[in-house]
């Protein structure tokens, strides 16, 4: 069990949690621990007030120039910036690297942070292949009832590359 606002894997247990996948023992074994905890595959945190905040999918991976990169890792780095309210990363096609990260950022109220500021923030702190090639500022996220619909972010106008070839 983690402390308030610490990120971790969301796991659920209780009489209302399903007992397994119909006719799929392997999927059931992957989803449920031996003592009945269901692993959602989501990363989240629990506030002091008891509210769960969704941060991303554990399996949301990009393949950048042959390197496996967790979108959540890049998001966590940019979420640590004092002027970033929320960030989301999706992979977009790239002729040179196959796929590159595109960063979507909602700035905190009153923030004037620029794309260039975010690139400077990341250089020398995270690996170059993890630095977003595109940055889009956004205030209105495409949402389901509970999560950002990342697949819809891929349809946004990314603008010009801000880093790399």
Region annotations inferred by a language model:
Residues 1-3, 10, 146, 164-165:
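Proteins with a high burden of low-complexity, intrinsically disordered sequence enriched in S/T/G/P/A and R
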Residues 2-4, 19-24:
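Active-site glycine/GP-rich loop and adjacent strand/helix microenvironment
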Residues 9, 14, 19-20, 29-30, ...:
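AMP-binding/adenylate-forming catalytic core of the ANL superfamily
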Residues 36:
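A structured beta-alpha segment of the ubiquitous adenosine-cofactor-binding alpha/beta core
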Residues 156-165:
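Acidic/polar alpha-helix N-cap and adjacent early helical turns
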């Amino acid at each position: 069990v983690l402390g308030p606002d610490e990120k971790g894997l969301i796991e659920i247990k209780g009489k209302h949690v399903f007992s397994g996948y119909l006719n799929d023992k392997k999927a059931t074994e992957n989803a449920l621990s031996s003592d009945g905890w269901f692993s959602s595959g989501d990363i989240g945190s629990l506030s002091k007030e008891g509210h769960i905040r969704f941060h991303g999918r554990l399996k949301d991976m990009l393949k950048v120039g042959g390197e496996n990169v967790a979108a959540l890792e890049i998001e966590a780095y940019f979420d640590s910036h004092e002027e970033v309210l929320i960030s989301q990363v999706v992979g977009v096609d790239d002729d040179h690297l196959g796929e590159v990260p595109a960063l979507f950022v909602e700035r905190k109220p009153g923030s004037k942070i620029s794309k260039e500021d975010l690139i400077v923030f990341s250089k020398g702190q995270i690996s170059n292949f993890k630095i977003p090639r595109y940055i889009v500022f956004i205030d209105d996220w495409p949402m389901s009832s509970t999560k950002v619909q990342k697949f819809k972010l891929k349809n946004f106008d990314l603008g010009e590359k801000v880093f790399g070839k």
